[in-house]
Structures are given as structure tokens and as C-alpha cells.
Amino acid sequence: GDVYGFYSGKENGYVSAGVFYKDGKAIKDVAADGFKNVFCVQKDGSVQICSFDEFQSIKDNTMQALGGWDRLIANGKAVEYSINDNNMSFHPRTFMGVDEDCRKVLLFVIDGRQPGYSNGMRMEDMIYVCQGAGCHNAMNLDGGGSTTMVYRVEQGNKATFEIMNKPSDNPARSVANGLLVVEKK
């Protein structure tokens, strides 16, 4: 989910670096430097990826929100990013986008750091994937060993959760929060 899960030393363990809303309530409404992008679901069901500053004008209408790292695409255009080792190197990546109509969410999980299986992606590669998938806005979430996709499997009266990808950390890394996709019945 959110970028990094800084260990707070408190009994609850990890703390989200970015904004985090659940069911219309702010769990965390401030963002650390560098974590200034937000994915949110509005009361009308529309979805957005916006800057922290833009989020301030819509937060009262927000049901769910999750902070993010770098913006990859803003209003249909690739965003320029800084040239540094993290952005130019191949790493496991987790990123997401929304379509122009603000109705469709696209989620991407890319394994990496596993020679012979997957090297990962660079920032530029993520932008190309988002453009090809039709993302109008997109942002980078936490990657590296935090890149994990879990699927709920129902078997009779029981449900189990299975890891669908091959995380580079083994076992899966503890994180502060995540993005849960739920079908309302």
C-alpha cells in the first residue's frame, strides 16, 4: 500500500508515511516529505490520483485514501522524475493508475531482485506500462520487498489469503497498511 511503513517504536509498530483514510475517517491526514500523492475513492464512487495539495479540497468527500510516492502520470502526461539510483535501477514495483473517467482503477505488481525470474522495472518502464494501459493519472507506491499481492480464497465457511506474486523478501515484509479491493454485495 502506502510508501514505506516507518517503525514508530510504539506497540502498533509501523506508521504510514502518507495520507490514510478508511470509511470516511482520517486515520492519518498528513504526509511526510516526498510522500505527497494520494489515491482516493469519493462518496460517489469516483476514484482519483492527485497531489496532497489537490486532496485538501476534496478530502471532506473522501471515503478511502492511500498515500503514494512519485506521480508517474498527471492528467494524461508523463511526469518528469529525478535521476537517481532508485528511479534508474530495476526494482520490484507496486504502482497504480486511474482512467480519464475516474471510474477504473488499475493495479500493477512487478516482482524483481530475482535473477532468472524477474529483475523488476525502472521508473521509466512503469510510466510506459501506465500509458499503454490507458492511465490518465498514476502513482508509485512502496516497492522493493513490500511489493506483495494477496488474494482471498474462500473454501466453504473458511477463507485463506494466498500471496499471488513472488516477493523479493522472504517471508513477506510487514507494512503499515495496504490497498484492499472488496466487492460490495
Sequence positions of predicted segments:
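Gly/Ser/Thr/Pro-rich low-complexity, intrinsically disordered segments
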Residues: 1-185
